[in-house]
From Swiss-Prot:
Xref: InterPro entries: Furin_repeat (IPR006212), Growth_fac_rcpt_cys_sf (IPR009030), R-spondin (IPR051514), Rspo_Fu-CRD_dom (IPR043601), TSP1_rpt (IPR000884), TSP1_rpt_sf (IPR036383), TSP1_spondin_dom (IPR044004)
One GO CC annotation: extracellular space
Signal peptide segment: 1-20
SMART domains membership: FU, TSP1
Protein name, entry field: R-spondin-3
GO-annotated molecular function: frizzled binding; heparin binding
Free-text note regarding domains: The FU repeats are required for activation and stabilization of beta-catenin.
Disulfide bonds: C41-C48, C45-C54, C57-C76, C80-C95, C98-C105, C102-C111, C114-C125, C129-C189, C195-C237, C206-C213, C246-C253
UniProt subunit comment: Binds heparin.
Domain TSP type-1: from-to ranges: 194-254
Entry's localization field: Secreted
Function description: Activator of the canonical Wnt signaling pathway by acting as a ligand for lgr4-6 receptors, which acts as a key regulator of angiogenesis. Upon binding to lgr4-6 (lgr4, lgr5 or lgr6), lgr4-6 associate with phosphorylated lrp6 and frizzled receptors that are activated by extracellular Wnt receptors, triggering the canonical Wnt signaling pathway to increase expression of target genes. Acts both in the canonical. Wnt/beta-catenin-dependent pathway and in non-canonical Wnt signaling pathway.
Length: 317
C-alpha cells in the first residue's frame, strides 16, 4: 500500500510538471508539488490532490479508493463499505477489498455475508453445502438439515417451527398435541389449564323469599370462588353455589316500628268499633225486651178485661 501511495505521488509530480510546461506560468525558483496539499482538503482528508482526492486521512479514518474510469479517487470514511474490510497501521488505515465471493467480510479469508448464489459456512462462501447441511435462502447460510415436519430448526434434532397443520412440542413436530397439552395461536403445544375452585363456605341463614320468619321450611345457600379459569380445552368450572332445604321453628314476623304503631292504632280502632257495635246491640236487645214486656203486659190486661166482661155477662143472665 505504501508503494501504491508513492506511485500516486510520482504520477501527480509528472502531471504537475507537464501542466507547468504547457502553461509556462510557473517559475523554477518556486517549484513544488502543488497538486498535493493539506490546504482546503475536505471530508476528513489530511492531504489531498485535485486529481485523486484524498491521499491520506485524519486519524481513525479509513482511506477508500473509488474507481472513476482510469482514475482512482481517494475518500476518507469512518468505516469501510460493503465488500471491503478495514486494516489499521501506525501510518494509515486502509479499506481492503474482500474476496470476490464475499459481500461482506471480517478479513480477506473470513466472509460475513455472501453474494447471491453462495451460502456462508464457517466464514467461507460455498455454492453447495457440506453433507448434513442444507442451504437456507432466508439466512443465505448452510444450516442443519431439519427433522421431518420441521419448517425451521435450531439443529438437526430441534425444531423451532413446524410445517402447516402440525404442532410444536419440546422441539418436535406432532400431528396432535400430547395429553394434557393444547395448541395456541402459534401452533405450539402448551400445558392445559384446568379450573380450580376454593372450598365451600359455611351454609347461610335459612330463609324463604328473602325472609327469615313466618315459615317452617326454607332454603339455605353456600358458595365457593373460582381460583383459576380453565384454558379452552381444560376442565370447566363446577357450580359455585349450592342450595338445600332447611327447617326452622316457625315464628311471627315483627313488622317495622312505624308499621307496628299503625297496626296498633288500627287494632285499637277495630276494638273500639266492636265495642260500640256491642253496646248498640245490647241497647237494641234492651229496647226489644221493653217492647216485649209492654206487649205482654198489654195482652195480660186485655185478657183480664175480657174475662171480667165474660163474668159480668154471665151474672146478668
Amino acid at each position: 500500500m505504501q508503494l501504491q501511495l508513492i506511485s500516486i505521488v510520482l504520477i501527480l509530480h509528472f502531471m504537475e510538471y507537464t501542466n507547468c510546461q504547457h502553461h509556462g506560468s510557473r517559475h523554477r525558483g518556486n517549484k513544488q508539488v502543488s497538486g498535493v496539499s493539506s490546504q482546503g482538503c475536505q471530508g476528513g482528508c489530511q492531504t489531498c490532490s485535485v486529481y485523486n482526492g484524498c491521499l491520506t486521512c485524519k486519524p481513525k479514518l479509513f482511506i477508500h479508493l473509488e474507481r472513476d474510469g482510469m482514475r482512482q479517487i481517494g475518500v476518507c470514511l469512518a468505516s469501510c463499505p460493503n465488500g471491503f474490510y478495514g486494516t489499521r497501521s501506525p501510518d494509515r488505515n486502509d479499506c481492503i477489498k474482500c474476496g470476490s465471493e464475499c459481500d461482506s467480510c471480517f478479513n480477506r479469508n473470513f466472509c460475513l455475508r455472501c453474494r447471491a448464489g453462495s451460502y456462508l459456512h464457517k466464514g467461507k462462501c460455498m455454492e453447495s453445502c457440506p453433507d448434513g447441511l442444507v442451504p437456507s435462502d432466508t439466512k443465505k447460510e448452510c444450516v442443519a438439515a431439519c427433522p421431518a415436519l420441521c419448517d425451521l430448526c435450531q439443529n438437526s434434532d430441534t425444531c423451532t417451527r413446524c410445517v402447516p397443520g402440525h404442532f410444536l412440542h419440546a422441539g418436535q413436530c406432532h400431528h396432535v398435541c400430547p395429553d394434557e397439552f393444547e395448541p395456541n395461536d402459534s401452533m405450539e403445544c402448551i400445558p392445559t389449564v384446568h379450573c380450580e375452585v376454593s372450598e365451600w363456605s359455611e351454609w347461610g341463614t335459612c330463609s324463604r323469599s328473602g325472609k327469615t320468619c313466618g315459615f317452617k321450611w326454607g332454603e339455605e345457600t353456600r358458595t365457593r370462588k373460582v381460583l383459576q379459569n380453565p384454558s379452552p380445552m381444560g376442565s370447566p368450572c363446577p357450580p359455585t353455589s349450592e342450595k338445600r332445604e332447611c327447617f326452622v321453628k316457625k315464628k311471627r314476623c315483627k313488622p317495622p316500628k312505624g308499621q307496628r304503631r299503625g297496626e296498633k292504632k288500627k287494632r285499637f280502632n277495630l276494638q273500639e268499633k266492636v265495642t260500640a257495635e256491642a253496646r248498640r246491640e245490647r241497647k237494641r236487645e234492651r229496647e226489644k225486651e221493653t217492647i216485649d214486656r209492654e206487649e205482654s203486659e198489654n195482652r195480660n190486661k186485655t185478657e183480664q178485661r175480657r174475662r171480667r166482661d165474660q163474668s159480668r155477662d154471665a151474672g146478668t143472665v
